[in-house]
């Protein structure tokens, strides 16, 4: 217990991809598994999604998984969308025939046993952390391994924003000024450019200038799309 608590304490802020790998490797070693995978899916827009993966899975399996489109029928992925509790792979195999096929192919690539834990963010992000082994003869999946792994989930969930920003495969994040964010936030409340100008004590022309800059930075064609992207990207927090 001391080791996992120390791992969490030393990695409160994940500010690089190396930090993320260190946490995953550390936990993987603590629970005595060979392989780990952290996958995270999020929506930069309402119609598009991005997936970030950090793992040490065999390259042969990752290539087959991606080329075969297994993510769309993977029972672990489907489970993680709407659940929070861990799931053993042995239990997931029984879900449907697609699941049995995927796990059989995984076994052929050295991933013979394991478990996964769903992870959810505040803005609809979802993902999972999985641990696996190729040695089923001496593999004893006890509840302690699962419980230990669950302790890391709040840390990963807390750092989802940093992970999407600093992951090795992440796209560059737009940097908005305080005024641009302020204008978008008021626009999200239904205020016109003239009303926003009155509220923040500036000219309507200046407000439109901020809208134009925000749209360019966010890759939006108009202020309404910019508002959507700003909310999904965490620039505007609708809960505050």
UniProtKB/Swiss-Prot annotation:
Tell me the keywords, alphabetical order.
Activator, DNA-binding, Quorum sensing, Transcription, Transcription regulation
Asked whether the keyword Transport is assigned, the reply is: no
User: Could you cite one Gene Ontology molecular function of this protein?
Assistant: DNA binding
Tell me the domain of life.
Bacteria
Q: What is this protein called?
A: Transcriptional activator protein VanR
Which Pfam family is an annotated match for this chain, by its short name?
Answer: Autoind_bind
Q: Which InterPro entries match?
A: Sig_transdc_resp-reg_C-effctor (IPR016032), TF_LuxR_autoind-bd_dom (IPR005143), TF_LuxR_autoind-bd_dom_sf (IPR036693), Tscrpt_reg_LuxR_C (IPR000792), WH-like_DNA-bd_sf (IPR036388)
Q: Which residues bind DNA?
A: 193-212
Q: Which family does it belong to?
A: Belongs to the autoinducer-regulated transcriptional regulatory protein family.
Question: PANTHER family of this UniProt entry?
Answer: DNA-BINDING TRANSCRIPTIONAL ACTIVATOR DEVR_DOSR
Gene Ontology biological process terms from the UniProt entry:
lactone biosynthetic process; quorum sensing; regulation of DNA-templated transcription
- Any keyword DNA-binding? yes
């Amino acid at each position: 217990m001391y080791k996992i608590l120390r791992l969490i304490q030393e990695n409160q802020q994940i500010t690089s991809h190396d930090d993320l790998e260190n946490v995953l490797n550390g936990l993987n070693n603590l629970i005595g598994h060979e392989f780990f995978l952290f996958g995270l899916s999020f929506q930069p827009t309402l119609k598009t999604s991005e997936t970030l993966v950090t793992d040490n899975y065999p390259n042969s399996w990752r290539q087959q998984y991606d080329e075969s489109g297994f993510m769309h029928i993977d029972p672990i992925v489907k489970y993680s969308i709407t659940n929070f509790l861990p799931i053993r792979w042995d239990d997931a195999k029984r879900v449907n025939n697609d699941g049995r096929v995927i796990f059989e192919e995984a076994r052929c690539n050295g991933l013979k046993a394991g478990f996964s834990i769903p992870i959810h963010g505040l803005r609809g992000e979802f993902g999972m952390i999985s641990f696996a082994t190729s040695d089923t003869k001496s593999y004893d999946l006890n509840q302690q391994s699962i419980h230990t792994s669950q302790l890391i989930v709040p840390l990963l969930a807390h750092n989802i924003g940093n992970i999407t920003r600093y992951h090795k495969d992440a796209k560059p994040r737009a940097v908005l000024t305080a005024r641009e964010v302020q204008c978008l936030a008021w626009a999200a409340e239904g205020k016109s450019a003239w009303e926003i100008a009155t509220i923040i004590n500036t000219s309507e022309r200046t407000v439109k200038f901020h809208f134009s800059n925000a749209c360019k930075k966010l890759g939006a064609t108009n202020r309404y799309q910019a508002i959507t992207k700003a909310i999904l990207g965490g620039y505007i927090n609708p809960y505050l």
